[in-house]
């Protein structure tokens, strides 16, 4: 995958963050993108994850359309749980600047032991999401569906 394409995908999801009014713990989007690249060997096809289903980024709504969309919903819910941790409260004011420590060896992700409680929780949210993405089929009919009419 081309890093610029992944950043475009993540930028779309970030734009949804601003509209959602949901406070979230830290997420380094470039780092999350690198996790995705580690696990999912998607070149240009990664662009197709933009505007997919009802849950691209926090603030999704409605019933997930398929397994991939459920992965995204679960990721949103995991971040909501992280936001309830006392250790994560301090990071809510700067949600995109903090990074966690992780490893990638032969397409296997691990969250490193040197993360504090909040970073470990967030790393595991992202790790679980990426693993879920890698096992979920992509359904072309769920791309660019128009969330207003399909995600109630």
Swiss-Prot record:
Entry GO CC: extracellular region
Where in or outside the cell it occurs: the entry states: Secreted
Protein EC = 3.1.1.4
In terms of one coarse class, where is the protein primarily found?
A: secreted
- PTMs per UniProt: This enzyme lacks one of the seven disulfide bonds found in similar PLA2 proteins.
Asked whether the keyword Heme is assigned, the reply is no
Q: Which residues form the propeptide?
A: 20-27
Reactions listed under catalytic activity: a 1,2-diacyl-sn-glycero-3-phosphocholine + H2O = a 1-acyl-sn-glycero-3-phosphocholine + a fatty acid + H(+)
Q: Key word Zinc-finger present in the record?
A: no
Active site residues according to the UniProt entry: 75, 126
Q: Which SMART domains match?
A: PA2c
The record's annotation in Gene3D superfamilies points to: Phospholipase A2 domain (1.20.90.10)
Among InterPro entries, the record links this protein to: PLipase_A2 (IPR001211), PLipase_A2_Asp_AS (IPR033112), PLipase_A2_dom (IPR016090), PLipase_A2_dom_sf (IPR036444)
GO terms (BP aspect)? arachidonate secretion; fatty acid biosynthetic process; lipid catabolic process; phospholipid metabolic process; positive regulation of fibroblast proliferation
Identify the cofactor(s): Ca(2+)
Q: Which pairs of positions does the record mark as disulfide bonds?
A: 38-104, 54-151, 71-132, 78-125, 88-118, 111-123
Give the co-factor note.
Binds 1 Ca(2+) ion.
GO MF annotation terms: calcium ion binding; calcium-dependent phospholipase A2 activity; phospholipid binding; signaling receptor binding; toxin activity
Q: Which UniProt keywords apply?
A: Calcium, Disulfide bond, Hemostasis impairing toxin, Hydrolase, Lipid degradation, Lipid metabolism, Metal-binding, Platelet aggregation inhibiting toxin, Secreted, Signal, Toxin
Tissues expressing the protein: Expressed by the venom gland.
Function recorded in the entry: Snake venom phospholipase A2 (PLA2) that inhibits collagen-induced platelet aggregation. PLA2 catalyzes the calcium-dependent hydrolysis of the 2-acyl groups in 3-sn-phosphoglycerides.
Instruction: Name the family the entry cites.
Output: Belongs to the phospholipase A2 family. Group I subfamily. D49 sub-subfamily.
Which protein is depicted?
A: Acidic phospholipase A2 S16-19
Q: Which organism is it from?
A: Austrelaps superbus (Lowland copperhead snake)
């Amino acid at each position: 995958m081309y890093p610029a394409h992944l950043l475009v995908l993540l930028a779309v999801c970030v734009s949804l963050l601003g509209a959602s009014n949901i406070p979230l713990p830290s997420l380094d989007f470039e780092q999350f993108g690198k996790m995705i690249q580690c696990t999912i060997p998607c070149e240009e096809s990664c662009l197709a994850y933009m505007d997919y289903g009802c849950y691209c980024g926090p603030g999704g709504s409605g019933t997930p359309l398929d397994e991939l969309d459920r992965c995204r919903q679960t990721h949103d819910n995991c971040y909501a749980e992280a936001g309830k941790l006392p250790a994560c409260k301090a990071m809510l004011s700067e949600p995109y600047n903090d990074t966690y420590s992780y490893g990638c060896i032969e397409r296997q992700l691990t969250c490193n032991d040197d993360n504090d409680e909040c970073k470990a929780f967030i790393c595991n949210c992202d790790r679980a999401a990426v693993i879920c993405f890698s096992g979920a089929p992509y359904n072309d009919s769920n791309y660019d569906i128009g969330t207003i009419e399909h995600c109630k």
